[in-house]
Amino acid sequence: MAGGIRKKTSLRDKSSRKSGLASKISEFKQQSTIENGQDEHFHENPLLKLSKISKKEKQQQKTDTFNQKLLHKVTFNTSSNISKSAVRRRKRKEKEQLKPKMDELLTSLPDDMFAPTAASTTTIRRATKTGEATSGYVKSTKANLNLPNANKATGHKQILKQENKNFTNVLKNPEFRQSPFSALKNAIKENLQG
């Protein structure tokens, strides 16, 4: 029966703590008024500490300590003293190893597939000035036009200038006054072909 009954001392403890706190506050006020003579930095609640450092100074201290920690801990070559180019080379090798190799593909295909026949083989011969045919390389059909690169800013500007000139030429064209859409269509076709 003694274990089932509890004393209600928690409320008394709270009230005694509050009264003790109030008495400490009043004592602190009296001491501070006597010592400082009601100084400007006096605050009603003695439990709140007046900050001696401004907010900007605190932030500056935090950033300084953080930067110092970074300088001591981090080096820019964190990958166990391997240069960036070496890491790139390794990655490139790994990618190349993943790609299928043509030799392996050729060995896996049947041999009779690649046997040369007279009908399938053709040799390219170029006629010379003297009239005799010699085997040589096929000339590239792609012409080097030295076109501006649209991906770069300077090339983009050049393309815009060219297009503006083309558009003004289309507007000056007498066909444009008769039928604007057909003139634009023809100009676009010419631009794509040339």
Curated annotation (Swiss-Prot):
Main location: nucleus
GO aspect biological process, one term: maturation of SSU-rRNA from tricistronic rRNA transcript (SSU-rRNA, 5.8S rRNA, LSU-rRNA)
Gene Ontology CC annotation, any one: preribosome, small subunit precursor
Region spans: Disordered: 1-45
Keyword entries, A-Z: Nucleus, Ribosome biogenesis, rRNA processing
InterPro entries: Slx9-like (IPR028160)
Pfam family, one: SLX9
Localisation per UniProt entry: Nucleus, Nucleolus
Entry function: Involved in ribosome biogenesis. Required for normal pre-rRNA processing in internal transcribed spacer 1 (ITS1). May be involved in the movements of the replication forks.
Subunit structure: Interacts with the 35S, 23S and 20S pre-rRNAs and with the U3 snoRNA.
Family: Belongs to the SLX9 family.
Record-given protein name: Ribosome biogenesis protein SLX9
UniProt organism field: Scheffersomyces stipitis (strain ATCC 58785 / CBS 6054 / NBRC 10063 / NRRL Y-11545)
